[in-house]
UniProtKB/Swiss-Prot annotation:
Protein name: UDP-N-acetylmuramoylalanine--D-glutamate ligase
NCBIfam families the UniProt entry points to: murD (TIGR01087)
Known EC number: 6.3.2.9
Domain of life: Bacteria
Annotated residues for binding of ATP: 112-118
Keyword check for rRNA-binding: no
Pfam families per the UniProt record, alphabetical: Mur_ligase_C, Mur_ligase_M, MurD-like_N
Family statement drawn from the similarity comment of this UniProt entry: Belongs to the MurCDEF family.
GO biological process: cell division; cell wall organization; peptidoglycan biosynthetic process; regulation of cell shape
Name of encoding gene: murD
Subcellular location: Cytoplasm
Amino acid sequence: MNAYQNKNITIIGLGKTGLSCVDYLLSQQANIRVIDTRKNPTGIDKLPQNIPLHTGSLNQEWLLESDMIVISPGLAVKTPEIQTALKAGVEVIGDIELFCRAATKPIVGITGSNGKSTVTTLVYEMAKAAGVKVGMGGNIGIPALSLLNEDCELYVLELSSFQLETTYSLKAAAVTVLNVTEDHMDRYMDLEDYRQAKLRIHHNAKVGVLNNEDRLTFGENENQAKHTVSFAENSADYWLKTENGKQYLMVKDEVILPCEEATLVGRHNYMNILAATALAQAIGINLDSIRTALRHFKGLDHRFQLVHQANGIRWINDSKATNVGSTVAALAGLYIEGKLHLLLGGDGKGADFSELAELINQPHIICYCFGRDGAQLAKFSSQSYLFETMEQAIEFLRPTLQSGDMVLLSPACASLDQFASFEKRGEEFTHLAQYSV
């Protein structure tokens, strides 16, 4: 008899992740109920009809009748109904905890405020180049539980702070917290509360990859990996060497790759490459396979992506920059011949935008602010314009563009005030950029 057979388990949240929990727990012969606080949740049509479903609110009675609650990462454990269930002795976990209890192959775990998806995909490509049967999922692409159905020798998981809050059994082969900057401040008490959720990834890990430029990423107390390696521009195991005007990605004294041979560009991407290389080497991936992946990896959509170039003007879609730290990373070390036309705005999620002030208050940077928090962002630049929508901003700036200029969508905000997702925002930007011909 398995641990879930005949247990009363309530799954909160449908969508891809919720349905993966349903499929897995059905295979374990559990008695399942599903709750979704939305009236018409996505995935409702894929739920087997014999499974009880409650929508529109949290059903406290169902929660208290449960042996276990599997909570959606989108719902905070601090929610009163969940706290009531916890006080009554009901176990509350997430889908990643279910996965970790079942997985028998090594896991690489990646979290951080920015760069998670790029590093996760890089490690996946490096393992694939080495001939390893590897599955990638979690907060990216496929729900982790769905990977259990695949023939994998290795799992590479992108993990959000929300997922880590309800994960207790992760014993990863290698992990990293890439960086910690303000994000989801509408969910956490403060930056330290958010950071502690991220640091849970280090618990029981064999190797922790540390960002030497960000002490907030270092594990502490029970959340420390057994062994650590570091990455940074200088003074680290994995570092960036500059010699005769050229840059090289290094591990100790060995060249991983000249930066000009990597398909990813920009200092923030070089840090991502170093972190991914450290993780890959920690699980035994050889440098030749790592080099192959780095030469062929094209990057991910909506992440500092060149979507149009004409008449000497570059249009860059960085719609995935949904927080201040991500936009800071995009602007750091950016060299432009002409003007930078920076599109900022959306839902700031309660973040402090002041960190942007010094970076954007430059003679060559003009800010075009839009969306819910556009007015707040516009205050930080002496050269700013305010619009209701991104489209209005682009139509305004278009006639002013000259050769050498860059139009950069790196909004420092979530998109949900005006768009269905950051992808939709990026797609609209791309469409408007390509229309510029």
